[in-house]
Amino acid sequence: MTLYFAYPNAESGDCKCLGLIFFVKDYYGEKVFPPIGCVGITQFENQASKTNYFSNVDKARSLQKRFMEEAGVDVVGRVKALLQSIVPPGLPVRLAQEDGKSYFAGLLRLINSSALIHADYGPFDGPGWEIGAIKAQLTWNILLKEVRGGESVVYNRFWKGKEDDDKYRDVTKSYGYSRDVIDGCESKKIAPIVGQIALFNPRNFHEVLAIENPEKVSRYTFSSFIGYLPPTAPEGPAIILWS
């Protein structure tokens, strides 16, 4: 069973941004529980309003640009270049867009405790958005600072949308599901390795385990989603990125 794959570590010099993450103070907390801090904006938080999402993209991108310049490495640009090098010739790799407005992609996220069991899939998270037209999805994550614990666990169980929401969604949490949804499922644990890009299908239910000594350290990652738009999509086939 293969639930994820990973590319080798970046050279140590490429991760000099690690020392700068402690100076990024302008992150806000995602409106989820357990709390997760991040630099950037997510479509998930703004499913009900495209206007609200796109009105905040420029601000999020400005902060991301500052971080990239200080770190001296364009993480999202490198991921796009990697994807472009392996997809069929002529298939564009670009940011997702709506009416000429680009989505934000490349979330810097910090988790001090854990992330609940959940799943992500454009057609369920964004019907009526460009991401709702994708036919396949991946997520990529790059760990920026070494931690103990904090493994991602991916379960061999696809999210079935409303059927699972009605049966397993934990209404006391903002996004989590009951553990019953993955009862008896095979799983794969992804050990976090600094600088390594790990990819998996986020429609598979997944979670992030707690790190050791969360009062002293945090788990910092860069991530976004990758989707495949088919030839029947209004803008034609493409590989798109968004957060």
From Swiss-Prot:
It holds the Pfam family WelO5. InterPro entries: WelO5-like (IPR055091). It comes from the Eukaryota. Induction: Expression is positively regulated by the leucinostatins biosynthesis cluster-specific transcription regulator lcsF. Part of the gene cluster that mediates the biosynthesis of the lipopeptide antibiotics leucinostatins that show extensive biological activities, including antimalarial, antiviral, antibacterial, antifungal, and antitumor activities, as well as phytotoxic. The function of lcsS within the leucinostatins biosynthesis has not been identified yet. This is Leucinostatins biosynthesis cluster protein S. It comes from Purpureocillium lilacinum (Paecilomyces lilacinus). The lineage of its organism: Eukaryota, Fungi, Dikarya, Ascomycota, Pezizomycotina. The gene is lcsS.
